[in-house]
C-alpha cells in the first residue's frame, strides 16, 4: 500500500483521481474515516475531527487489492510500503486554500506546516528511506502523476530534503 500525503491543498485528491483513471485502486483516508466512524472526537479549539488513525490504518490493512491511500494523515499508517509527500510553494498553496474558503487562521496554519516540512518530517520519522518528496509547484497534475508512477515503478527516486520552502517564513 502506497500512501500519498501532504498539506491540505497540495493536490492529493486530484492526483488520486488521475491514478484511479490509470487503473489503480485508490482510497481517500479522510472519506474512510468519516464513512466508517473512525473518529475520536473534535478538537475543542480548532473544531477539527480527531481521527482514530490506528483503527483506520488497521482497516486499510484488511482491504484487498488496495494500491494507494491518499490523505494528509496517511503517512501515519505504519503499514505503508512507500510514502510520497506532495509539496507546494506556500504562496501557491495560499491561493488554493483561500479559494476553498478556509478561514485565515486555518490558511496560515497550513502554510506554516508546508514551509516547515511537517508532513515530510513526520513521514520520515515513521518510514525512513521509504519516503519520497515531490514538488508539485508549476507542474500539471498529469506531470505529477507521471512522476509518482515512476517512483512507484522504481525508475525514479525523490528522497526527502530536496524541497525547501523554509525561506518563505522569513520573507
Curated annotation (Swiss-Prot):
SUPFAM superfamilies: P-loop containing nucleoside triphosphate hydrolases. It catalyses: AMP + ATP = 2 ADP; ATP + H2O = ADP + phosphate + H(+). One of its GO terms (molecular function) is ATP hydrolysis activity. Residues 99-109 are annotated as: LID. Transmembrane segments: none annotated. The keyword Nucleotide-binding applies. This is Putative adenylate kinase.
Amino acid at each position: 500500500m502506497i500512501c500519498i500525503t501532504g498539506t491540505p491543498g497540495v493536490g492529493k485528491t486530484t492526483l488520486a483521481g488521475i491514478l484511479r483513471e490509470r487503473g489503480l485502486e485508490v482510497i481517500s483516508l479522510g472519506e474512510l474515516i468519516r464513512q466508517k466512524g473512525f473518529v475520536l472526537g473534535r478538537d475543542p479549539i480548532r473544531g477539527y475531527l480527531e481521527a482514530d488513525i490506528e483503527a483506520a490504518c488497521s482497516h486499510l490493512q484488511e482491504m484487498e487489492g488496495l494500491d494507494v491511500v491518499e490523505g494528509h494523515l496517511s503517512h501515519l499508517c505504519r503499514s505503508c510500503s512507500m510514502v510520497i509527500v506532495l509539496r507546494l510553494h506556500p504562496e501557491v498553496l495560499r491561493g488554493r486554500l483561500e479559494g476553498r474558503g478556509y478561514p485565515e487562521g486555518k490558511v496560515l496554519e497550513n502554510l506554516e506546516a508546508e514551509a516547515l516540512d511537517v508532513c515530510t518530517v513526520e513521514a520520515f520519522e515513521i518510514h525512513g528511506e521509504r519516503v519520497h518528496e515531490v514538488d508539485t509547484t508549476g507542474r500539471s497534475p498529469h506531470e505529477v502523476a507521471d512522476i509518482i508512477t515512476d517512483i512507484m515503478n522504481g525508475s525514479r527516486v525523490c528522497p526527502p530534503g530536496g524541497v525547501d520552502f523554509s525561506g518563505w517564513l522569513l520573507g
